[in-house]
């Protein structure tokens, strides 16, 4: 008796192109929500989360609301993309922070992208106070802030960027860091700035006009802001451990920081922010 022939099965092609394989391994995350004032208290109204980015809301204290972003990917690698879109409704009080310092890892070529959109309605106050962003050597990242502040609204936005892990004896020698900030008030562009550091970043940071050899920089943007506020912020000068410049123009104030490491820079920033009347997130105090 003849042995029956087995049906021919075509093997499944499981190979992926290099670009498709790379895309399949990239982290993507998005958080979008808005808050409204209800019975004198700020409450979350709408929330969307996707991918590796999540947000948690600690127990509210007083009339304000706090939100904490969590990157479940554990960091940002080359080609990852994250987006945040937050709207604070009229009369609300919202503080935003992160669960930990954000780490931007070494890239083999692709650039990571972070897009942050903030909208602050009349009578509202939004405080953007994440923990520092740490760039590893050969990291590549592009970050964009699009901020719309209504007349009569208040904004405090503070960012710290650290080039390398000083505690591990590491410094960022090369890579790419592009940081774009656009601030509009009442629909009118008030402030536009793009910071671009690429190539031999270590050598550029050594220049006196850039970081004077420091490994950490920071910026605090305050709306509204005037010379009276600047004078009050400058009272913290006796506590500074790095270099700090504070000025005001066009209805807002700005403080720029530079220090040898993140510890000194954070201390300087806390000394300044403490004079704005803002309550710093508890994670900043640990």
Swiss-Prot record:
Signal peptide: none annotated. GO terms for molecular function: nickel cation binding. Pfam families: UreD. It comes from the Bacteria. Keywords: Chaperone, Cytoplasm, Nickel insertion. GO terms for cellular component: cytoplasm. UreD, UreF and UreG form a complex that acts as a GTP-hydrolysis-dependent molecular chaperone, activating the urease apoprotein by helping to assemble the nickel containing metallocenter of UreC. The UreE protein probably delivers the nickel. This is Urease accessory protein UreD. It comes from Rhodopseudomonas palustris (strain BisA53). The gene is ureD.
């Amino acid at each position: 008796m003849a042995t029956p022939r087995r049906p021919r099965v075509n093997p499944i092609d499981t190979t992926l192109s290099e670009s498709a394989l790379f895309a399949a391994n990239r982290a993507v995350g998005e958080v979008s929500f808005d808050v409204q004032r209800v019975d004198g208290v700020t409450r979350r109204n709408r929330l969307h989360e996707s991918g590796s980015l999540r947000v948690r809301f600690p127990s509210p204290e007083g009339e304000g609301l706090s939100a904490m972003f969590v990157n479940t990917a554990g960091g940002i690698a080359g080609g990852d993309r994250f987006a945040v879109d937050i709207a604070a409704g009229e009369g609300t009080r919202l503080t935003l922070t992160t669960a930990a310092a954000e780490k931007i890892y070494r890239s083999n070529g692709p650039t990571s992208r972070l897009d942050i959109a903030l909208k602050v309605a009349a009578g509202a106050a939004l405080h953007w106070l994440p923990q520092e962003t740490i760039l590893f050597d050969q990291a590549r990242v592009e970050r964009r802030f699009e901020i719309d502040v209504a007349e009569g609204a208040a904004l405090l936005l503070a960012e710290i960027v650290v080039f390398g892990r000083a505690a591990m004896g590491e410094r960022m020698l090369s890579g790419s860091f592009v940081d774009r900030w656009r601030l509009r008030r009442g629909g009118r562009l008030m402030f536009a700035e793009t910071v671009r550091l690429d190539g031999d970043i270590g050598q550029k940071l050594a220049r006196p006009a850039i970081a004077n050899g420091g490994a950490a920089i920071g910026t605090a943007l305050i709306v509204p802001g005037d010379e009276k506020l600047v004078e009050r912020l400058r009272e913290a000068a006796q506590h500074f451990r790095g270099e700090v410049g504070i000025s005001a123009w066009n209805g807002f104030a700005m403080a720029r920081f530079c220090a040898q490491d993140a510890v000194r820079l954070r201390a300087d920033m806390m000394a300044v922010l403490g004079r704005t009347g803002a309550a710093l997130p508890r994670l900043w105090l640990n």
